[in-house]
Amino acid sequence: MYTNKQIWSVSFPILLSLLAQNVINVTDTALLGHVSEVALGASAMGGLFYICVFTIAFGFSTGSQIVIARRNGEGRYSDVGPVMIQGVMFLFVMALLLFGFTKAFGGNIMRLLVSSESIYEGTMEFLDWRIYGFFFSFINVMFRALYIGITRTKVLTVNAIVMALTNVVLDYALIFGKFGLPEMGIKGAAIASVLAEASSILFFVIYTYLTVDLKKYGLNRLRTFDPALLMRILSISCFTMLQYFLSMATWFVFFVAVERLGQRELAIANIVRSIYVVLLIPVNALATTTNSLVSNAIGAGGIQHVMPLINKIARFSFFIMLGLVAVSALFPQFLLSIYTSEAALITESVPSVYVICFAMLIASVANVVFNGISGTGNTQAALLLETITIIIYGSYIVFIGMWLKAPIEICFTIEIVYYSLLLITSYIYLKKAKWQNKKI
């Protein structure tokens, strides 16, 4: 079984890469928080729409990563490249289609969901530029799948730093009009994010060409479209695509409900969500590691090590989160002051931070256990569990947010409900279901 050192050697670079990537999220939120509440709220709605679409590609890459990790564990290294190449081709076509769809219907969709005219206008100003990122981010996730699948994760850290630095500099320059560039506000934030994603893909291409044994991994020649291979990948990926989309779509429903409570509540939700995402970074890194190591272990014939491996990573994740939550709960005002200097907004956001801190303790275990299921290749079961949980999530937020119009901190209790259900259903599945013989 994998040692703590081996687990950490895979997960730590992923953690650093996620940390650097989330500099983009924090930077956008923090800088726009100093522009206006409308800009902050509009970037939240536009950003969530973008992420909902992006998660379809991310779900495909996660399924591809499972296949790549299984081939790597089996020692079938030359079969890794074809999975990567077919994935890139598929996602580029998907980027074209989703870009066209958003251009044609994005405005109509947002008009139905956003009640405030000023928020709507800001959201569309952001989205009109942000969706160009599809062409870069969709390809980036396949490089991520490749390197996690073959457990060469250190490159992800460097790549994320390149992307984060590009975004921070361009965000500051384009939002506020520095370094001789025009002041563009929320539009500048969108353009900065797109250019940061472009810098990321440029780095990945150069790094892969210079450092990877292209022949060993079957990356030394381009291949024609292979429908049979793509269908094998999709037999795993289609479930993760739908799973991730549904998961993010419920976040979007959450923000739609909050937007109807008012601009102040939407601003609070965006700030607290940013803190929430940062707290989740080590959990997501360890969950991704679980996914890859479980698939590698099964590929190498180590099915008996799967449950002990998941339990070990889950304990690791919980104790890391315990430390982060302690700091966050003791100093919430300091964290909130990064995003806004308005004293009243900080004070009103503190209760929501406490709620999220409690939810994160459950999430630290739930995400690891749930990703263990995906790592076995049983992505259809993972989708079913996620769907059950999401139906309850959606019903809860519609009831307390849209019907009762409860305070924002009460709305955030949905995260406690969500992760509790996810943990219980995932644990029961791994204990009771027959997942050991899944072939991919």
Predicted regions and their residues:
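Helix-terminus/linker motif at the lipid-water interface of multi-pass membrane proteins
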Residues: 19, 23-41, 110-117, 173-184, ...
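Transmembrane alpha-helix boundary and packing residues in multipass membrane permease domains
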Residues: 14, 18, 30, 66, ...
